[in-house]
Amino acid sequence: MSSLRAIWRLSAACWLFAVLALSLPLIRLVGGPRRAHRFFLGWIGAMHRTLNLKVERIGELPDEPSILLGNHPSYLDIFLCYDRRPTAIVAAREFKWFPFVGWAAQAIGTVWVHRKCPESRKRIVPCVIDAVKAQRSAFLFPEGRTTDGVLPSTVRVGMFKAAAEAGVPVTYVGIRYGNGKAAYFHDLKGGFVPHLLRHLWSLLCEPQIEVSLRYSRPQRLTCPERGMRRFENFVRWHLRRDVPLQPAHAVYRG
């Protein structure tokens, strides 16, 4: 039964990726960016139902354009990278030409970064800042790679520094999966694709995947290092299973 479920979900997900890749550029051309974003949000909802992702949100999405900074426990996080307004998503260049996934990511205007290249990381900074100043949001993972889902990995300070210098607001997003199987880590060296496919198949066999998203209140940073520490503490706090759920603004008030 679980194998049949996985086959159906994989087929439906590939079809949805193809629909997004083919339809979104045309919708954006004819109807404009806002209509394209509404289509994208509908697509996200369809993907959640297809994968049976049960998403719990704690706190609110920001009312103003913001840089959303999230921890990165799984590749499933790509289905959680959205805001109520058009959003620029930063992703690893390695996935740009992946069948279905890469095609769809190119259609939504993903900003690609070579994670091991400092110059590439520097080049994406103005793209993110310009997006926010153009009344869009941006979503990225300052860890730069997926982790084991237990604690955040090493966080790079670059985007915190850029946000502080530009005076644009940032919102922290804590991502916690109820099923430990969702977390995924690989060094992207030998054997990555077979390892990824085996892990994906095991997730597709799961009856349901629960995920909890916790949003902080938007804040303008004055000290990049302090903002980075706040992000790390916010994520660690959310990942603790023994902490009762409470409003996101209870963590940081300034």
What are these language model-derived features?
Residues 1-56, 103-107, 206:
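A transmembrane-helix-recognition feature enriched in membrane-embedded lipid enzymes
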Residues 20-31, 64-118:
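Catalytic core of membrane glycerolipid acyltransferases/transacylases, capturing the structured
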Residues 54-55, 89, 112, 138, ...:
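Hydrophobic beta-strand scaffold residues
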Residues 65-67, 135-141, 169:
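Residue-level preference for the first positions of well-ordered beta-strands
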Residues 101-102, 150-226, 245-253:
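A cross-family acyltransferase "interaction/gating" segment
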Residues 111-132, 137:
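A membrane-cytosol interface segment of integral membrane proteins
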Residues 112-115, 216-221, 234-237:
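Polar-ligand-bearing catalytic/cofactor-coordination segments
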Residues 131-160:
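Catalytic-site beta-strand/loop segments enriched in glycine and acidic/polar residues
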